[in-house]
């Protein structure tokens, strides 16, 4: 993290640099005009992680600044949401004089929501005992006077939830209110306001869709829930069990009745669709009954494996959200053989960094 680069006065310039870089990187695919979705210039991150520095009686948060090649004290953190900055100050004031809570504490993670919840995870290089639980319970009671907070303690092979290990985010997407369970230590989009823009873009890109939707890498159902309105049915896959559980919870609380979640990898699902193997997890699900003309993918940074790319090429329309332009570019070398880009977007999920979130809609040539 380059803390010196995080100057709101430079926000527009850094976004323009990303625009130019992305347009240049994908020029060979002859995409349409790039749609650019900006972030707030400060207080945009809903989660943050800090290491803890113990110096005598003092205790403070720090991050490692790659530009300086040094640890930098962080009493406040400009990218983090206001609720995280407020909690940082309140929490450190309680931890510093409390031996039971600060002893061998090495990291603090914050997960917050636009709707006002915050989850604090305290990570230790020691096993947590009953004294820790008692002190943490008192800490939660004190902080609850100001925050809607839950606290988790973590150590090697140990996790203590004082109440729950998740928050519920509430987003307004095209005037529709959506609720999302977000679990501690699981992936969620860090920039909630840009996430809303991504959802609205995806809804618009698929608004004239016919038939059903197949989604790979669905996570906690972030896009699944929002896109369900545009399709008769949605079949979605995800491998991580906590994410599958959260996705099912989100389907229920949003009263969505046309989504089926399958817990399996994209690679295994590709084998199932090609009828190379049979899977017990697919018992009772008639894959042939789905009329999927559109496929949606939001893969990890490594991109999509060759077999899954072959599966994806079989669909008329491909909606691809990418957190890594390099692997998207590589995947488009294959997908571009059969499909052309009709929508092209940049979402500034990570201001002041080199990371770029992008989206493309591809239609069969």
From Swiss-Prot:
EC nos: 2.1.1.-, 2.1.1.35
Catalysed conversion reaction: uridine(54) in tRNA + S-adenosyl-L-methionine = 5-methyluridine(54) in tRNA + S-adenosyl-L-homocysteine + H(+); uridine(341) in tmRNA + S-adenosyl-L-methionine = 5-methyluridine(341) in tmRNA + S-adenosyl-L-homocysteine + H(+)
Binding site for S-adenosyl-L-methionine: 189, 217, 222, 238, 298
Gene Ontology cellular-component terms listed: cytosol
GO molecular function, one term: tRNA (uracil(54)-C5)-methyltransferase activity, S-adenosyl methionine-dependent
CDD domains, A to Z: AdoMet_MTases (cd02440)
InterPro entries: MeTrfase_TrmA_AS, MeTrfase_TrmA_CS, SAM-dependent_MTases_sf, TrmA_MeTrfase, U5_MeTrfase_fam
Xref: Gene3D superfamilies: 2.40.50.1070, Vaccinia Virus protein VP39
GO-annotated biological processes: tRNA methylation
Positions of the catalytic residues: 323, 357
Alphabetical UniProt keywords: Methyltransferase, S-adenosyl-L-methionine, Transferase, tRNA processing
Free-text function comment from the UniProt entry: Dual-specificity methyltransferase that catalyzes the formation of 5-methyluridine at position 54 (m5U54) in all tRNAs, and that of position 341 (m5U341) in tmRNA (transfer-mRNA).
Family: Belongs to the class I-like SAM-binding methyltransferase superfamily. RNA M5U methyltransferase family. TrmA subfamily.
Protein name according to UniProt: tRNA/tmRNA (uracil-C(5))-methyltransferase
Source organism of this protein record: Shewanella frigidimarina (strain NCIMB 400)
High-level lineage: Bacteria, Pseudomonadati, Pseudomonadota, Gammaproteobacteria, Alteromonadales
């Amino acid at each position: 993290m380059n803390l010196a680069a995080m100057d709101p006065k430079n926000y527009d310039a850094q976004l323009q640099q990303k625009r130019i870089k992305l347009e240049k990187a994908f020029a060979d695919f002859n995409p349409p005009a790039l749609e650019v979705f900006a972030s707030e210039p400060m207080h945009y991150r809903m989660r943050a992680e800090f290491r803890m520095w113990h110096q005598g009686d003092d205790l403070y948060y720090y991050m490692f600044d790659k530009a300086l090649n040094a640890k930098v004290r962080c009493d406040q953190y400009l990218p983090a949401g206001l609720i995280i900055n407020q909690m940082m100050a309140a929490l450190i004031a309680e931890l510093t004089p409390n031996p039971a809570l600060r002893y061998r504490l090495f990291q603090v993670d914050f997960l917050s929501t636009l709707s006002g919840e915050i989850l604090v995870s305290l990570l230790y290089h020691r096993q947590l005992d009953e004294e820790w639980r008692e002190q943490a319970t008192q800490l939660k009671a004190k902080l609850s006077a100001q925050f809607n907070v839950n606290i988790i303690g973590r150590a090697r092979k140990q996790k203590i939830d004082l109440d729950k290990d998740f928050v519920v985010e509430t987003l307004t997407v095209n005037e529709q209110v959506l609720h999302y369970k977000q679990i501690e230590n699981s992936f969620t989009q860090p920039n909630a306001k840009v996430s809303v823009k991504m959802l609205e873009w995806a809804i618009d890109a698929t608004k004239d869709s016919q038939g059903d939707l197949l989604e790979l890498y669905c996570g906690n159902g972030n896009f699944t829930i929002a896109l369900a309105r545009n399709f008769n049915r949605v079949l979605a896959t995800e491998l991580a069990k906590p994410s599958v559980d959260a996705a099912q919870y989100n389907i229920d609380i949003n009263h969505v009745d046309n989504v089926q979640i399958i817990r399996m990898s994209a690679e295994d699902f590709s084998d199932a669709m090609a009828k190379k193997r049979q899977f017990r997890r697919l018992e009772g699900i008639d894959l042939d009954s789905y009329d999927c003309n559109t496929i949606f993918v939001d893969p990890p940074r490594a991109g999509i494996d060759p077999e899954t790319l072959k599966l994806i090429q079989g669909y008329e329309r491909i909606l691809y959200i990418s957190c890594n332009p390099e692997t998207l570019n590589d995947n488009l070398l294959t997908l571009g053989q059969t499909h052309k880009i009709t929508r092209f977007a940049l979402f500034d999920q990570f201001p002041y960094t080199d990371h770029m979130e992008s989206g493309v809609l591809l239609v069969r040539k």
